[in-house]
Amino acid sequence: MPSLDLDVFDPAFIPKPGQLFLRDFKTRVTPNDTQRNTLIVAGVYIVVIFILWHLPYLRVITPLSLVLSNLICARLLTVGFHEMSHAFVGVLTCAKIYSIELDPDEGGATSMSGGIPWLTLPAGYLGSSFIGAALIACGFNTNASKVASIVMAVFFLFTLWWARKNWLSWLLILGMSGLIVLFWFVGGGIALRYFVLFIGVMSCMYVIWDVVDDTLARKVNTSDASEFARICGCCPSRVWGFIWLVVACIFFALGIIVGLVSFKQNLEQQKIDSSHFLPVPGASSGALSLSPNHYRAAWTITISLSVLGLL
């Protein structure tokens, strides 16, 4: 067998560690068919959310008003994530939380005293961005979505404790909790996966749009960025708003990347895994589990949330 003379090899053809990493990363983030469908649905969510936020007169058109009511309910939920993030960091910094209020027109407000303001103020946007990114990543896998829904239920309990005097918070959280239970039964949990994905996209979009609207496009003196700028004194509110916007976009992208890298299972494999992890009672008989179709599940979510929005 002839020997190989390693000296004749051109070092330029030997891949460098950085090139190997980029090649491996590109392979891991390349979506399979199931992930590609998930990305398409997420893209549709983004387009619908963006259009309805900029065309409020669509309320007068009956079919689109259903979707708009859906959007309002989901937006209130993401506002709840924002306020809950304020409260959570407030508790960690020894603040006293008095109440959390949600309002469909004004957004939300967290009443507290004490704590560290330069931590509690940015926690709203950064916390809801992180939650949105985590939900987007979980939206690529059925079992991960089940875990995410349980974590959301814990968030709901804390929010209800601090917002126990706000009836809108009770209606919203009880309604969303009912939808989580309902979607758990649809398609072996596939509808729950798209519901979690929708809430994740909505949470990230809320942060991006709210920062742009309150800080960059127009200056609101009562915004988190304005209060943070007043406390720090080193930069104007628009600078902090821009920084938070960049961080929110990074979280959004990381949520998608983590989902693509971590959850490569196809639809059939996810269905099998889901049947062994917190399975739906009676799902094996097919009595309670509907056909696991991507777009049917997405439409089920849209219709159900629209009904909730009309209540």
Give residue spans per PLM region.
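Terminal transmembrane helical module of multi-pass membrane proteins
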Residues: F185-S274
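C-terminal GPI-anchoring signal of eukaryotic secretory precursors
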Residues: C232, P279-A298
